[in-house]
């Protein structure tokens, strides 16, 4: 749930800054791009450090080399977040992050079905996780294409 709160909170703060007169944040698309980038920088940070073992456990057994997959997806999240902030590649970053979200969804299903934890807290159930994934996909697509 924390990534959702970062996405929503960053978007709201950016909109408030825009309403206060900062031209860049006057457009909701810019606010959404910054919010998506903030969310993915946050989620990427979990790929290293104390949460890493939890993410490795989330990878379904059918996928080989779970540690490598966690590392690669972390780098992909960072690249996508940077791309969201670089107007010439925003659309490409949007497509890449959308593909990444779909590709990582089996890990979220696995975590929900096995009631795994991240940093000691149980991951959201499958219904909640699916709704969040749809929200994240919509945000990524809207940020890149609107």
Positions of PLM-derived features:
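Membrane-interface extramembranous regions
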Residues: 1-146
């Amino acid at each position: 749930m924390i990534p959702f709160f970062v996405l929503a909170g960053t978007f709201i703060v950016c909109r408030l800054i825009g309403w206060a007169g900062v031209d860049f944040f006057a457009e909701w698309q810019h606010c959404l791009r910054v919010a998506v980038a903030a969310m993915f920088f946050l989620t990427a940070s979990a790929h290293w450090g104390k949460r890493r073992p939890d993410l490795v456990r989330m990878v379904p057994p059918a996928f080989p080399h779970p540690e490598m997959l966690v590392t690669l997806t972390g780098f992909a999240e960072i690249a996508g977040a940077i791309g969201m902030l670089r107007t010439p590649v925003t659309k490409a970053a949007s497509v890449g992050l959308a593909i990444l979200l779909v590709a990582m969804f089996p890990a979220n299903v696995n975590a929900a079905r096995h009631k795994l934890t991240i940093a000691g807290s149980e991951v959201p159930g499958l219904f909640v996780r699916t709704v969040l994934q749809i929200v994240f996909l919509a945000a990524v697509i809207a940020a890149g294409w609107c």
